[in-house]
């Protein structure tokens, strides 16, 4: 399923929302009343020029930063994050640009990194021994479910290509998220073939029912995969665009401020 046949509709349920987020770093205002809306079953790309506030927005949504003002709403309930662990507890998983995979560990160990399954009884509760067999079995199941073609879950991540490593990171997020997956530049520094591999995996995550927030500077990838495009500008939500109705050049013009959103035809807005 590509973006042109995505199931997303304007009436889709709002999964995650932010209203009036403000974030200041000393004298610098990174977010100045930013709004955000993520719908069920969509891939929402977040784009913006340097200093537009997209990174601060994503940090607030993932719990990495606490906003000074405003509110974040998940499934209709206002939530407050003190840190990324709080976001993970409510089913929001984030893959940052630096991947955060452990190269020397196996794929199975990476999938359960920080969420290791322990053996039952004395062995697990007292001796803290891991149930490696169960983790391996579940890793195989989860990777097969997302159709990630990696030969063995017992091979070290350092033996994988860049695209395969990114797929491991995305699959780990999808395995434990039950609300939202946030991906920060998932195809950065990847070749064409590996970039396409990651994009296809992101589609499958979406098609499994998890909405995806995709932060990217790669406009061809954004237009290939996104259902809607959130444009961050000057610390606010500049516009939300329909990639099937607006050109890439006009999108860049909106992002840089050369084209005011109010001058766009209504069909270009989403």
Per-segment meaning from a language model:
Residues 2-270:
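Glycine-rich phosphate-binding loops of nucleotide-dependent enzymes
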């Amino acid at each position: 399923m590509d973006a042109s046949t995505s199931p997303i509709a304007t009436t889709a349920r709002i999964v995650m929302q932010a209203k009036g987020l403000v974030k200041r770093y000393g004298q610098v205002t990174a977010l100045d009343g930013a709004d955000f809306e993520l719908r069920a079953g969509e891939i929402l790309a977040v784009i913006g020029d340097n200093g537009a506030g997209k990174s601060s927005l994503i940090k607030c949504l993932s719990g990495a930063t606490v906003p000074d003002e405003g509110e974040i709403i998940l499934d209709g309930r206002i939530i407050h994050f003190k840190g990324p662990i709080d976001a993970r507890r409510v089913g929001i998983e984030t893959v940052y640009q630096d991947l955060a995979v452990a190269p020397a560990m196996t794929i199975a160990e990476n999938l359960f990194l920080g969420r290791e399954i322990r053996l039952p009884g004395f062995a697990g509760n007292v001796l803290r021994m891991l149930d490696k067999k169960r983790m391996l079995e579940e890793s195989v199941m989860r990777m097969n479910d997302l159709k990630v073609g990696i030969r063995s879950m017992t091979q070290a991540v350092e033996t994988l290509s860049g695209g395969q490593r990114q797929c491991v990171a995305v699959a780990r997020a999808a395995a434990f998220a039950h609300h939202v997956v946030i991906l920060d530049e998932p195809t950065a520094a990847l070749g064409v073939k590996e970039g396409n591999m990651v994009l296809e995996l992101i589609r499958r995550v979406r098609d499994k029912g998890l909405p995806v927030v995709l932060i990217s500077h790669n406009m061809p990838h954004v237009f290939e995969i996104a259902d809607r495009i959130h444009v961050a500008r000057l610390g606010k939500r500049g516009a939300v665009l329909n990639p099937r109705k607006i050109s890439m050049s006009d999108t860049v013009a909106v992002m840089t401020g050369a084209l005011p959103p109010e001058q766009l035809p209504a069909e270009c807005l989403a």
